[in-house]
Protein backbone atom coordinates (compact mmCIF):
# COMPACT_ATOMS: atom_id res chain seq x y z
CA UNK A 1 0.00 0.00 0.00
CA UNK A 2 1.19 3.52 -0.80
CA UNK A 3 2.49 5.35 2.27
CA UNK A 4 0.07 8.26 1.86
CA UNK A 5 -2.86 5.96 2.66
CA UNK A 6 -1.41 4.43 5.84
CA UNK A 7 -2.57 7.08 8.37
CA UNK A 8 -6.18 7.12 7.17
CA UNK A 9 -6.49 3.38 6.53
CA UNK A 10 -6.81 2.44 10.18
CA UNK A 11 -9.70 4.90 10.54
CA UNK A 12 -11.81 3.20 7.87
CA UNK A 13 -14.51 0.72 8.96
CA UNK A 14 -13.06 -2.79 9.09
CA UNK A 15 -15.58 -4.09 6.57
CA UNK A 16 -14.53 -1.41 4.09
CA UNK A 17 -10.86 -2.14 4.75
CA UNK A 18 -11.38 -5.81 3.91
CA UNK A 19 -13.29 -5.03 0.72
CA UNK A 20 -10.82 -2.36 -0.46
CA UNK A 21 -7.58 -4.15 0.39
CA UNK A 22 -7.33 -6.25 -2.81
CA UNK A 23 -7.26 -2.99 -4.78
CA UNK A 24 -5.96 -0.16 -2.59
CA UNK A 25 -3.44 -2.48 -0.95
CA UNK A 26 -1.28 -2.51 -4.07
CA UNK A 27 1.58 -0.04 -4.47
CA UNK A 28 0.40 0.71 -8.01
CA UNK A 29 -3.19 1.53 -6.98
CA UNK A 30 -4.22 4.28 -9.45
CA UNK A 31 -6.62 6.09 -7.07
CA UNK A 32 -9.62 4.86 -9.03
CA UNK A 33 -11.94 1.88 -8.93
CA UNK A 34 -13.44 0.21 -11.96
CA UNK A 35 -17.18 -0.38 -12.07
CA UNK A 36 -16.63 -4.07 -11.31
CA UNK A 37 -14.39 -3.30 -8.34
CA UNK A 38 -16.90 -0.78 -7.00
CA UNK A 39 -19.69 -3.32 -7.43
CA UNK A 40 -17.73 -5.89 -5.43
CA UNK A 41 -17.07 -3.42 -2.61
CA UNK A 42 -20.70 -2.28 -2.51
CA UNK A 43 -21.87 -5.88 -2.24
CA UNK A 44 -19.41 -6.71 0.55
CA UNK A 45 -20.28 -3.59 2.56
CA UNK A 46 -23.99 -3.26 1.77
CA UNK A 47 -23.41 0.18 0.24
CA UNK A 48 -25.11 1.99 -2.62
CA UNK A 49 -23.21 4.27 -5.01
CA UNK A 50 -23.50 7.36 -2.83
CA UNK A 51 -22.64 5.63 0.44
CA UNK A 52 -19.50 4.14 -1.08
CA UNK A 53 -18.39 7.47 -2.55
CA UNK A 54 -18.78 9.22 0.81
CA UNK A 55 -16.92 6.39 2.57
CA UNK A 56 -14.01 6.80 0.14
CA UNK A 57 -13.59 10.55 0.72
CA UNK A 58 -10.97 10.21 3.51
CA UNK A 59 -8.89 7.98 1.25
CA UNK A 60 -9.17 10.49 -1.60
CA UNK A 61 -8.20 13.38 0.69
CA UNK A 62 -5.04 11.49 1.65
CA UNK A 63 -3.67 12.48 -1.77
CA UNK A 64 -3.96 16.21 -1.01
CA UNK A 65 -0.91 18.46 -1.35
CA UNK A 66 -1.50 21.36 1.03
CA UNK A 67 1.78 23.08 2.01
CA UNK A 68 -0.06 26.39 2.44
CA UNK A 69 -3.51 25.71 3.91
CA UNK A 70 -2.87 22.30 5.51
CA UNK A 71 -6.58 21.72 4.78
CA UNK A 72 -7.20 18.48 2.92
CA UNK A 73 -10.26 17.96 0.73
CA UNK A 74 -11.24 14.78 -1.10
CA UNK A 75 -13.63 14.21 -3.98
CA UNK A 76 -14.97 11.23 -5.89
CA UNK A 77 -16.20 11.54 -9.48
CA UNK A 78 -18.48 8.71 -10.63
CA UNK A 79 -18.54 8.19 -14.36
CA UNK A 80 -21.51 6.92 -16.29
CA UNK A 81 -19.34 3.83 -16.80
CA UNK A 82 -19.61 3.20 -13.05
CA UNK A 83 -15.90 3.86 -12.48
CA UNK A 84 -14.92 5.94 -9.45
CA UNK A 85 -12.12 8.49 -9.74
CA UNK A 86 -10.38 10.00 -6.70
CA UNK A 87 -9.53 13.68 -6.45
CA UNK A 88 -7.80 15.90 -3.90
CA UNK A 89 -6.86 19.56 -3.56
CA UNK A 90 -3.34 20.53 -4.60
CA UNK A 91 -1.34 23.63 -3.65
CA UNK A 92 2.12 24.68 -4.81
CA UNK A 93 4.46 26.66 -2.59
CA UNK A 94 6.18 29.60 -4.23
CA UNK A 95 3.55 30.31 -6.90
CA UNK A 96 0.32 32.38 -6.81
CA UNK A 97 -2.73 30.88 -5.13
CA UNK A 98 -4.53 31.07 -8.48
CA UNK A 99 -2.56 27.98 -9.51
CA UNK A 100 -4.28 25.90 -6.81
CA UNK A 101 -6.24 22.83 -7.93
CA UNK A 102 -9.50 22.09 -6.13
CA UNK A 103 -10.52 18.54 -5.24
CA UNK A 104 -13.51 18.56 -7.59
CA UNK A 105 -11.33 19.77 -10.48
CA UNK A 106 -8.85 17.04 -9.66
CA UNK A 107 -11.41 14.22 -9.65
CA UNK A 108 -13.09 15.45 -12.84
CA UNK A 109 -9.81 15.90 -14.70
CA UNK A 110 -8.62 12.51 -13.45
CA UNK A 111 -11.73 10.94 -14.99
CA UNK A 112 -11.32 12.90 -18.23
CA UNK A 113 -7.67 11.95 -18.67
CA UNK A 114 -8.48 8.28 -18.12
CA UNK A 115 -11.07 8.31 -20.90
CA UNK A 116 -14.36 8.73 -19.05
CA UNK A 117 -16.92 10.27 -21.42
CA UNK A 118 -19.48 11.66 -18.97
CA UNK A 119 -19.98 11.99 -15.21
CA UNK A 120 -23.01 10.94 -13.22
CA UNK A 121 -22.03 12.52 -9.90
CA UNK A 122 -19.38 14.29 -7.86
CA UNK A 123 -19.06 13.63 -4.12
CA UNK A 124 -17.00 15.98 -1.97
CA UNK A 125 -16.24 16.60 1.73
CA UNK A 126 -17.48 20.19 1.73
CA UNK A 127 -19.93 22.23 -0.30
CA UNK A 128 -18.34 23.13 -3.68
CA UNK A 129 -17.04 26.68 -3.90
CA UNK A 130 -18.25 29.00 -6.65
CA UNK A 131 -15.09 28.35 -8.66
CA UNK A 132 -15.80 24.61 -8.78
CA UNK A 133 -19.49 25.08 -9.49
CA UNK A 134 -18.57 27.12 -12.55
CA UNK A 135 -15.93 24.56 -13.56
CA UNK A 136 -18.50 21.75 -13.38
CA UNK A 137 -20.95 23.80 -15.44
CA UNK A 138 -18.70 23.23 -18.45
CA UNK A 139 -19.23 19.46 -18.37
CA UNK A 140 -21.35 17.56 -20.86
CA UNK A 141 -23.32 16.26 -17.86
CA UNK A 142 -24.99 19.67 -17.68
CA UNK A 143 -26.64 21.12 -14.62
CA UNK A 144 -28.24 17.75 -13.84
CA UNK A 145 -24.90 16.46 -12.57
CA UNK A 146 -25.54 15.07 -9.08
CA UNK A 147 -23.63 16.61 -6.17
CA UNK A 148 -23.32 14.59 -2.97
CA UNK A 149 -22.08 15.75 0.43
CA UNK A 150 -21.76 13.80 3.70
CA UNK A 151 -24.90 13.96 5.84
CA UNK A 152 -26.79 16.10 3.33
CA UNK A 153 -29.50 15.36 0.81
CA UNK A 154 -28.28 14.96 -2.74
CA UNK A 155 -28.83 17.84 -5.15
CA UNK A 156 -27.99 18.65 -8.73
CA UNK A 157 -25.56 21.26 -9.99
CA UNK A 158 -28.57 23.36 -10.94
CA UNK A 159 -29.34 23.69 -7.21
CA UNK A 160 -25.81 24.91 -6.45
CA UNK A 161 -25.57 27.16 -9.51
CA UNK A 162 -29.02 28.64 -10.23
CA UNK A 163 -29.45 30.96 -13.22
CA UNK A 164 -26.06 29.81 -14.42
CA UNK A 165 -23.96 31.24 -17.24
CA UNK A 166 -22.15 28.64 -19.28
CA UNK A 167 -21.25 27.24 -22.68
CA UNK A 168 -24.86 27.03 -23.86
CA UNK A 169 -25.17 30.80 -23.51
CA UNK A 170 -22.26 31.19 -25.92
CA UNK A 171 -23.51 28.69 -28.48
CA UNK A 172 -20.96 26.01 -27.60
CA UNK A 173 -22.24 22.53 -28.42
CA UNK A 174 -19.11 20.39 -27.92
CA UNK A 175 -18.60 20.34 -24.16
CA UNK A 176 -15.94 19.31 -21.68
CA UNK A 177 -15.46 15.51 -21.74
CA UNK A 178 -16.93 15.15 -25.23
CA UNK A 179 -14.40 13.18 -27.33
CA UNK A 180 -12.48 15.41 -29.77
CA UNK A 181 -9.39 15.21 -31.97
CA UNK A 182 -8.20 18.50 -33.41
CA UNK A 183 -5.81 16.76 -35.80
CA UNK A 184 -2.62 18.77 -35.26
CA UNK A 185 0.68 17.13 -36.19
CA UNK A 186 4.40 17.52 -35.49
CA UNK A 187 7.34 15.88 -37.24
CA UNK A 188 9.03 14.10 -34.35
CA UNK A 189 9.60 10.67 -32.87
CA UNK A 190 10.07 12.02 -29.33
CA UNK A 191 7.59 10.09 -27.18
CA UNK A 192 7.16 12.89 -24.65
CA UNK A 193 6.46 15.44 -27.38
CA UNK A 194 3.98 13.11 -29.07
CA UNK A 195 2.21 12.58 -25.75
CA UNK A 196 1.89 16.34 -25.28
CA UNK A 197 0.66 16.70 -28.87
CA UNK A 198 -1.99 14.03 -28.31
CA UNK A 199 -3.08 15.89 -25.18
CA UNK A 200 -3.33 19.14 -27.14
CA UNK A 201 -5.44 17.40 -29.77
CA UNK A 202 -7.87 16.32 -27.05
CA UNK A 203 -7.86 19.64 -25.18
CA UNK A 204 -10.94 21.80 -24.71
CA UNK A 205 -10.64 25.45 -25.72
CA UNK A 206 -13.82 26.53 -27.54
CA UNK A 207 -13.54 30.19 -26.50
CA UNK A 208 -9.96 31.02 -27.50
CA UNK A 209 -9.21 28.05 -29.79
CA UNK A 210 -5.84 28.00 -28.04
CA UNK A 211 -5.43 24.25 -27.80
CA UNK A 212 -2.53 23.02 -25.70
CA UNK A 213 -1.17 19.96 -23.98
CA UNK A 214 1.68 19.00 -21.72
CA UNK A 215 3.56 15.83 -20.87
CA UNK A 216 5.66 15.26 -17.77
CA UNK A 217 8.34 12.62 -17.44
CA UNK A 218 8.70 11.65 -13.81
CA UNK A 219 12.03 10.52 -12.41
CA UNK A 220 10.24 7.19 -11.97
CA UNK A 221 10.14 6.91 -15.78
CA UNK A 222 6.37 7.34 -16.05
CA UNK A 223 4.85 9.84 -18.51
CA UNK A 224 1.88 11.94 -17.41
CA UNK A 225 -0.18 13.87 -20.03
CA UNK A 226 -2.22 17.00 -19.35
CA UNK A 227 -4.86 18.79 -21.44
CA UNK A 228 -6.09 22.37 -21.30
CA UNK A 229 -9.73 22.71 -20.11
CA UNK A 230 -11.20 26.13 -20.85
CA UNK A 231 -14.22 27.66 -19.14
CA UNK A 232 -16.95 30.06 -20.23
CA UNK A 233 -16.07 32.27 -17.24
CA UNK A 234 -12.36 32.15 -18.25
CA UNK A 235 -10.84 32.24 -14.72
CA UNK A 236 -11.90 28.68 -13.75
CA UNK A 237 -10.05 27.33 -16.81
CA UNK A 238 -7.55 24.58 -15.94
CA UNK A 239 -4.09 24.87 -17.57
CA UNK A 240 -2.57 21.76 -19.15
CA UNK A 241 0.31 21.64 -16.67
CA UNK A 242 -2.11 21.43 -13.76
CA UNK A 243 -3.93 18.60 -15.51
CA UNK A 244 -0.69 16.66 -15.85
CA UNK A 245 0.22 17.38 -12.21
CA UNK A 246 -3.20 16.05 -11.22
CA UNK A 247 -2.55 12.75 -12.96
CA UNK A 248 0.98 12.58 -11.58
CA UNK A 249 0.01 13.19 -7.97
CA UNK A 250 -3.22 11.20 -7.88
CA UNK A 251 -1.45 8.22 -9.49
CA UNK A 252 1.14 8.21 -6.72
CA UNK A 253 3.89 10.16 -8.48
CA UNK A 254 5.97 12.95 -6.99
CA UNK A 255 5.36 16.46 -8.36
CA UNK A 256 8.78 17.48 -7.04
CA UNK A 257 10.49 14.77 -9.09
CA UNK A 258 9.88 15.84 -12.69
CA UNK A 259 12.76 14.87 -14.99
CA UNK A 260 11.52 16.68 -18.10
CA UNK A 261 8.44 18.56 -19.28
CA UNK A 262 7.03 19.39 -22.71
CA UNK A 263 4.39 21.94 -23.71
CA UNK A 264 2.76 21.86 -27.14
CA UNK A 265 0.42 24.61 -28.36
CA UNK A 266 -0.58 26.58 -31.45
CA UNK A 267 1.97 28.99 -32.91
CA UNK A 268 -0.63 31.69 -33.59
CA UNK A 269 -2.94 31.13 -30.59
CA UNK A 270 -4.60 34.08 -28.87
CA UNK A 271 -3.03 33.04 -25.57
CA UNK A 272 -0.02 31.03 -24.48
CA UNK A 273 0.61 28.66 -21.58
CA UNK A 274 4.39 28.97 -21.95
CA UNK A 275 5.41 31.50 -19.30
CA UNK A 276 3.05 30.19 -16.60
CA UNK A 277 4.13 26.62 -17.30
CA UNK A 278 7.83 27.49 -17.04
CA UNK A 279 7.27 29.45 -13.84
CA UNK A 280 5.45 26.64 -12.05
CA UNK A 281 7.89 24.00 -13.28
CA UNK A 282 10.77 26.08 -11.91
CA UNK A 283 9.04 26.28 -8.53
CA UNK A 284 8.70 22.49 -8.62
CA UNK A 285 12.41 22.08 -9.35
CA UNK A 286 12.13 21.09 -13.01
CA UNK A 287 14.57 22.85 -15.36
CA UNK A 288 14.30 20.57 -18.42
CA UNK A 289 11.47 22.19 -20.35
CA UNK A 290 10.86 21.88 -24.09
CA UNK A 291 8.40 23.97 -26.08
CA UNK A 292 6.83 23.03 -29.41
CA UNK A 293 4.21 24.69 -31.60
CA UNK A 294 2.01 23.40 -34.40
UniProtKB/Swiss-Prot annotation:
Keywords: Hydrolase, Metal-binding, Zinc. Zn(2+) binds at residues 102, 129, 132. CDD domains: cytidine_deaminase (cd01283). InterPro entries: APOBEC/CMP_deaminase_Zn-bd, CMP_dCMP_dom, Cyd/dCyd_deaminase_Zn-bd, Cyt/Deoxycyt_deaminase, Cyt_deam_dimer, Cytidine_deaminase-like, Cytidine_deaminase_bacteria. It comes from the Bacteria. One of its GO terms (molecular function) is zinc ion binding. Binds 1 zinc ion. GO terms for biological process: cytidine deamination. Its EC number is 3.5.4.5. This enzyme scavenges exogenous and endogenous cytidine and 2'-deoxycytidine for UMP synthesis. Homodimer. This is Cytidine deaminase. Its cofactor is Zn(2+). The gene is cdd. The active site is at 104 (proton donor). Coiled coil: none annotated. GO terms for cellular component: cytosol. Substrate binds at residues 89-91. Belongs to the cytidine and deoxycytidylate deaminase family. It comes from Photorhabdus laumondii subsp. laumondii (strain DSM 15139 / CIP 105565 / TT01). It catalyses: cytidine + H2O + H(+) = uridine + NH4(+); 2'-deoxycytidine + H2O + H(+) = 2'-deoxyuridine + NH4(+). Residues 48-168, 187-294 form the CMP/dCMP-type deaminase domain.
